């Protein structure tokens, strides 16, 4: 089964960064969908506005058929957590907080709440990632917190994207970071240590925090067939759930 990724999207610039990161991860063969959390039931007009908002996001990346979810919940983080559990999602992707300087990472309130006990891996995009369409993942760093799930996730993503996994955090340049949950975190839940929280908030590249004991298994790229007329075409287009 393909990895399932949900992008939290509300048509702001920072959530366009989240969509850019989701698309980047989807080159691994993952299934991608968009989600918007409405905080009240409202009426037919509000429902249509939410659906139109998500449709614009899907169309902006040339994927009008991308699955979209409108969730009604007073809390964005709760609504997304419930959606992830219902859909069997592996990753929820966020943009950084709206006042974040370009090229840096700062989780907003919903992302931060899910970094304190969420049921799925949490990815956060640097601000203005949307403005760098040529960005790629070539070298992946790992902070494992004593949990092999972080390195297993990094190795799986590296295999899928043809990227290298650094031997240790801080060992030279990286352009993506995978972080494990702290040792006392309940199995299957995301919880950052103070040191890892600092690493996330001082990062200048996308970050993925994985639940304790539950690696994200990205699909490896299929080897090119000898008869393929264009073996140099690069990764296939991201999958749509």
Residue ranges of model-derived segments:
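Short glycine-rich, flexible loops that bind phosphorylated cofactors or substrates
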Residues: 100-101, 185-187
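Charged helix-capping and loop-helix junction motifs
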Residues: 49-53, 106-111, 190-196
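Intrinsically disordered or low-complexity boundary/linker segments at protein termini
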Residues: 1-17, 90-102, 106-107, 112-155, ...
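Charged docking surfaces used in two-component/phosphorelay signaling
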Residues: 70-79
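Active-site charged/polar residues at nucleotide-handling catalytic sites that mediate phosphoryl
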Residues: 87, 172
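Short, conserved loop/helix-junction motifs that constitute active-site signature segments
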Residues: 24-29, 158-161, 201-202
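Acidic, proline/glycine-rich short linear motifs
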Residues: 24-58, 167-171, 215-241
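A structural alpha-helix within SAM-dependent methyltransferase catalytic domains
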Residues: 19, 23-25, 81, 155
């Amino acid at each position: 089964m393909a990895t399932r990724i949900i992008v939290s999207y509300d048509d702001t610039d920072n959530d366009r960064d989240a969509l850019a990161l989701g698309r980047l991860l989807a080159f691994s063969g993952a299934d991608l969908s968009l989600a918007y959390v409405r905080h009240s039931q409202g009426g037919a007009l509000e429902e249509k506005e939410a659906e139109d908002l998500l449709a614009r996001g899907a169309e902006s990346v040339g994927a009008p058929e991308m699955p979209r979810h409108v969730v009604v919940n007073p809390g964005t983080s709760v609504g997304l957590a419930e959606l992830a559990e219902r859909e069997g999602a592996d990753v929820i992707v966020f943009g950084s907080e709206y006042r974040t300087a370009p090229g840096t990472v700062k989780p907003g309130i919903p992302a931060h709440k899910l970094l304190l006990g969420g049921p799925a891996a949490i990815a956060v995009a640097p601000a203005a990632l949307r403005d760098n369409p040529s960005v790629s993942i070539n070298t992946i760093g790992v902070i494992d917190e004593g949990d092999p799930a972080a390195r297993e996730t990094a190795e799986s993503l590296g295999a899928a994207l043809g990227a290298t996994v650094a031997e240790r955090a801080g060992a030279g340049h990286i352009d993506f970071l995978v972080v494990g949950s702290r040792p006392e975190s309940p199995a299957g839940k995301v919880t950052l240590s103070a040191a890892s929280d600092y690493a996330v908030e001082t990062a200048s590249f996308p970050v993925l925090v994985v639940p304790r004991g539950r690696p994200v298994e990205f699909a490896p790229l299929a080897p090119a067939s000898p008869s393929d007329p264009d073996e140099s075409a690069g990764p296939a287009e991201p999958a749509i759930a």
